[in-house]
Amino acid sequence: MAGPSLACCLLGLLALTSACYIQNCPLGGKRAAPDLDVRKCLPCGPGGKGRCFGPNICCAEELGCFVGTAEALRCQEENYLPSPCQSGQKACGSGGRCAVLGLCCSPDGCHADPACDAEATFSQR
């Protein structure tokens, strides 16, 4: 009697779990795998040295950020591309990424953020 009950309980627990098994589990677990569909945002600014951080925001490490200027016009092309993009490597603020030293940018704008210290780098490196 205890054998079938134990087997049913184990099968029930197995059905309810969604664990990674040894063959297919990435290092760090299921959610640790990087999103492979994200590409680098378009280059922008003088000499293409910057990257788009929003439809009107272009940031270049050496030059700072251009918001709503002619240097950022190319960034509007991102609205017409089918795949998402990401600039900057370090997350900051509410859905933003570190753009230049001390500055966090999201598609809505940029603001000063202490999380964007000297380690904030561009993904183009």
UniProtKB/Swiss-Prot annotation:
The modification Glycine amide is found at G28. Disulfide bonds join C20-C25, C41-C85, C44-C58, C52-C75, C59-C65, C92-C104, C98-C116, C105-C110. SUPFAM superfamilies: Neurophysin II (SSF49606). InterPro entries: Neurhyp_horm, Neurhyp_horm_dom_sf, Neurohypophysial_hormone_CS. It comes from the Eukaryota. It holds the Pfam family Hormone_4. Interacts with oxytocin receptor (Ki=1.5 nM). Interacts with vasopressin V1aR/AVPR1A (Ki=37 nM), V1bR/AVPR1B (Ki=222 nM) and V2R/AVPR2 receptors (Ki=823 nM). Belongs to the vasopressin/oxytocin family. This is Oxytocin-neurophysin 1. It comes from Homo sapiens (Human). The gene is OXT.
